[in-house]
């Protein structure tokens, strides 16, 4: 699929409207996303940002764009230093450790590695050179080894966030310092303090301010002017506002064409944040839920909308994905006896009219939602569910069909599976594991949540079989209901009883 044939509309925070994506260089996209400050395990608010922009990255690639994706690590920061001092640990060792832990989480969530993942500590020369340019342009000033940016020299300051300069007050996300010319001025360089990491600079030893880091790295890996800049909604002010001011001051031809911001994850109607001590780490959630279920949950609302975290929502995502993979596994098993026939046919047989229609609707609905500002909410419902229902209904009919009719149906099912897999792949919900392996992993997570092992379930199944033989149906129902409350459904197939995950009949609203 050629990118030019489909118009992707993205909501641009700067203009507050959806705009058609028109790259600076045809066929190529430069994308910069602000990464984490690495001092602790990442929470699912961080996961929301990562998954949101991973979906964008994947979809741009799906549209055949050549994407240069940069996501940084802040490994030099006050929070890192404070945590390292409490731990009695070197700040860079601490941040390196949590950068690595973050990458483990990203792998679990199926987030593709960006083209570049720079760390602040590795780009001091770029940062210092940019600060020098800002001072040369009379937009920065030095005070006792510190360097501040003069916001009065930035005529468009506040345009992105809607924060008027005269309304900006010290103490409101703005550091209080009487040496500043304007309370809203912010640090480009901080003079060294005892027992803190520092680097040599023209203004003496010190370390960079937070905002200059992203300006320097985006210019270094992309250019002063690039296509898309992303991050969490909380970064609009002051971080992104300050980035714009710095880059414009240092570079004549600069700017970002599209500013994208993902919504917060909330818990009990409050933004999830480490500072509020109300966060759930990615590692904590994936200990009892499959990472794909967490990813599905994070895509269950349009990326700009707030997302309310509840256990019941995670259970819903887990159940929805299990159904998808169980259907695809059933399809694999159903097609297995006909592989030789499909090979011999060699594509001679045509798809059924209904099969073609199913695929067309699936693809059309998927593309229309994604092209409309990456609207992943309910993306695996509608036409996608119709495709799954068609698979399930068709598998039971295969043996009864005449050869020619059966071959057309087999070809249709193969093509429907390809279309279903493509959607999963673009959404990052497809792994290198087989369907059976993913289902096995999801069942294991169900057992962890239910606090019961395979042996415990087997024992309860045997007790239920005995109860049914004795016509003790009250006992039989009690066992079934007990397991259903834990998210385990029993199914009687012939003389055999098997289990699969289900939505718990009494799911808690939070975890």
UniProtKB/Swiss-Prot annotation:
Superkingdom per UniProt: Eukaryota
Catalyzed reactions per annotation: tRNA(Cys) + L-cysteine + ATP = L-cysteinyl-tRNA(Cys) + AMP + diphosphate
Co-factor note (free text): Binds 1 zinc ion per subunit.
Record carries keyword Metal-binding: yes
Molecular function GO terms recorded: ATP binding; cysteine-tRNA ligase activity; metal ion binding
Names of the cofactor(s): Zn(2+)
Enzyme Commission designation: 6.1.1.16
Residues reported to bind Zn(2+): 34, 214, 239, 243
The TPR repeat ranges on this chain: 315-348, 368-401
Short motif ('HIGH' region): ranges: 36-46
This protein's UniProt keywords: Aminoacyl-tRNA synthetase, ATP-binding, Cytoplasm, Ligase, Metal-binding, Nucleotide-binding, Protein biosynthesis, Repeat, TPR repeat, Zinc
UniProt subcellular location: Cytoplasm, Cytosol
Motif 'KMSKS' region per record, residues: 271-275
Entry GO CC: cytosol
Residues reported to bind ATP: 274
Chief site of localization: cytoplasm
GO process annotations (BP): cysteinyl-tRNA aminoacylation
Cross-referenced NCBIfam families: cysS
Family, similarity comment: Belongs to the class-I aminoacyl-tRNA synthetase family.
HAMAP family per record: Cys_tRNA_synth
Protein name: Cysteine--tRNA ligase 2, cytoplasmic
Protein's organism: Arabidopsis thaliana (Mouse-ear cress)
């Amino acid at each position: 699929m050629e990118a030019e044939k489909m118009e992707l509309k993205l909501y641009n925070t700067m203009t507050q409207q959806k705009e058609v994506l028109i790259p600076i260089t045809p066929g190529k996209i430069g994308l910069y996303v602000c990464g984490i400050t690495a001092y602790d395990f990442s929470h699912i608010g961080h996961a929301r940002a990562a998954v949101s922009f991973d979906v964008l990255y994947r979809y741009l690639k799906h549209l055949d764009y050549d994407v240069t994706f940069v996501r940084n690590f802040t490994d030099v920061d006050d929070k890192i230093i404070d945590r390292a001092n409490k731990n009695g640990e070197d700040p860079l060792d601490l941040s390196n450790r949590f950068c690595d832990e973050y990458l483990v989480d990203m792998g679990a969530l199926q987030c593709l590695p960006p083209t570049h993942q720079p760390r602040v500590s590795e780009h001091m020369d770029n940062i210092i050179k940019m600060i020098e340019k800002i001072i040369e342009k009379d937009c920065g000033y030095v005070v006792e080894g510190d360097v501040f940016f003069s916001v009065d020299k930035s005529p468009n300051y506040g345009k992105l966030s809607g924060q008027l300069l005269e309304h900006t007050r010290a103490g409101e996300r703005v550091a209080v310092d009487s040496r500043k010319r304007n309370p809203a001025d912010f640090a480009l360089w901080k003079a060294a303090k005892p027992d803190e990491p520092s680097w040599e600079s023209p203004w003496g030893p010190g370390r960079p301010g937070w905002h200059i880091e992203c300006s320097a790295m985006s210019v270094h890996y992309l250019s002063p002017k690039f296509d898309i800049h992303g991050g969490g909604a909380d970064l609009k002010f002051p971080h992104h506002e300050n980035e714009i001011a710095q880059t414009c001051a240092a570079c004549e031809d600069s700017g970002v064409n599209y500013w994208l911001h993902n919504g917060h994850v909330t818990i009990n109607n409050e933004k999830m944040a480490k500072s509020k001590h109300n966060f759930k780490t990615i590692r904590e959630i994936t200990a009892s839920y499959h990472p794909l279920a967490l990813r599905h949950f994070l895509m269950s609302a349009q990326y700009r909308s707030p997302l309310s975290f509840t256990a019941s929502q995670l259970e819903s995502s887990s159940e929805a994905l299990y159904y998808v993979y169980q259907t695809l596994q059933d399809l694999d098993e159903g097609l297995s006896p006909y592989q030789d026939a499909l090979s011999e046919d060699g594509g001679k047989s045509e798809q059924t009219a209904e099969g073609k229609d199913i695929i067309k609707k699936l693809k059309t609905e998927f593309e229309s939602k994604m092209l409309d500002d990456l609207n992943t909410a309910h993306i695996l419902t509608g036409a996608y569910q119709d495709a799954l229902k068609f698979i399930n209904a068709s598998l039971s009919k295969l043996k009864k069909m005449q050869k020619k009719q059966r071959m057309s149906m087999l070809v249709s099912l193969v093509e429907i599976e390809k279309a279903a897999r493509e959607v999963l792949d673009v959404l990052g919900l497809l792994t290198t594991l087989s369907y059976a392996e993913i289902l096995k992993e999801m069942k294991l997570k169900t057992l962890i949540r239910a606090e019961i092992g395979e042996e415990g379930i087997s024992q309860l199944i045997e007790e239920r079989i005995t109860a049914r033989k004795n016509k003790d149906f009250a006992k039989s129902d009690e066992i079934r209901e007990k397991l259903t409350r834990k998210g385990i459904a029993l199914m009687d197939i012939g003389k055999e009883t098997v289990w699969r995950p289900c939505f718990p009949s009494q799911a808690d609203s939070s975890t």
